[in-house]
UniProtKB/Swiss-Prot annotation:
Keywords: ATP-binding, Nucleotide-binding, Repeat, Transport. It comes from the Bacteria. GO terms for cellular component: ATP-binding cassette (ABC) transporter complex; ATP-binding cassette (ABC) transporter complex, substrate-binding subunit-containing; membrane. This is Uncharacterized ABC transporter ATP-binding protein YphE.
Amino acid sequence: MFTATEAVPVAKVVAGNKRYPGVVALDNVNFTLNKGEVRALLGKNGAGKSTLIRMLTGSERPDSGDIWIGETRLEGDEATLTRRAAELGVRAVYQELSLVEGLTVAENLCLGQWPRRNGMIDYLQMAQDAQRCLQALGVDVSPEQLVSTLSPAQKQLVEIARVMKGEPRVVILDEPTSSLASAEVELVISAVKKMSALGVAVIYVSHRMEEIRRIASCATVMRDGQVAGDVMLENTSTHHIVSLMLGRDHVDIAPVAPQEIVDQAVLEVRALRHKPKLEDISFTLRRGEVLGIAGLLGAGRSELLKAIVGLEEYEQGEIVINGEKITRPDYGDMLKRGIGYTPENRKEAGIIPWLGVDENTVLTNRQKISANGVLQWSTIRRLTEEVMQRMTVKAASSETPIGTLSGGNQQKVVIGRWVYAASQILLLDEPTRGVDIEAKQQIYRIVRELAAEGKSVVFISSEVEELPLVCDRILLLQHGTFSQEFHAPVNVDELMSAILSVH
């Protein structure tokens, strides 16, 4: 068990600078990480966090400045720098997990280093090695279990266990809980505390302040490529941290106040069953209403939206749009009926990263921007620029590849796509996942503006604390049905308690 008696640096960046064409990614950054320390790395998207991480892992070379791992300077050519950083004990777990779904937990943990005996893979030794690694972090899964059968939380823990197998000095966790529900976050927090107790230094990247305070003792806050401040979390307010991130005073958003909603149903779901997660789902969405759906990961929230929009088939039930019954929804038909849908994973299903902002904006409604089958690019750019202005999208131009934008700007384009298409009903699945605080607040504002214009929104989020900030009404999905209903203003503590309760 590691006990810190004095600060022992295990990683340092000294006067680190990095520039890309037209962008200063890091500007004279000094950063120190000590043995056994859990240090949060905070900042808006584009603040320089990712560049700093890439430097520490050796995937980026600084234009000037030094990187030290322990007492060794990290140096070498681009082809060998990443391997050298790994040899010195730097590991990273990114948002997009790299596990091989078709292999077992043990095979993933030992990938590339499978033990051999008499020229053959020693599966018994592999299982024993994997079990020791899992037990060290308190991960309760079988080494023989296929990764494809694990829950998202279990996969995240196996990914963390894999980097721990090499006895690292430094582990970087980039948004490790962004796809996890509140109850499952506890498993990751427990694993990180065990890593720290073993003397491993952890850099923890997250936008969830409550979680950060539970797991980290200190934080480095970045803004515009610089270190805006190094703080001890126990005596630093969240208001001050957010002010460091934004470079100005932060105004907290109050929960939505009760609104007078027109009693006009635009979407009704009646007794919908979609095995294995949804048993008996009924609800009504009214004109100008923002309806939140809360629940644990795996409760079936995403499956519900996919069933409504026609991406997944359901066994029984009715969907009614503006009074018209739809027996078997078809995605293309639902779009024509004025429903817009933003998927849970925008990178896989929401954007085409190599296309420009303009082409991504008009993906779903080519009729508006074509004449005699020919795309009218002047019209496309004009409409896209209008959407970019409305949605406060920051990009060099409407032709900028969307994959180069920050997560928040990508998400605003995805939502803006349906504003452009004049959709009257928006189904938003995790619209603020992986975006920074300022972008979240902009998305809240946009959603409320759309509701004020008479559009109706279903809003799913695993960040329970944000639902009261944007929703007029919240339904709690538990055990395949809606168990409770909350009306604005919603107390987040009551909502959280209801979500975590066991009935």
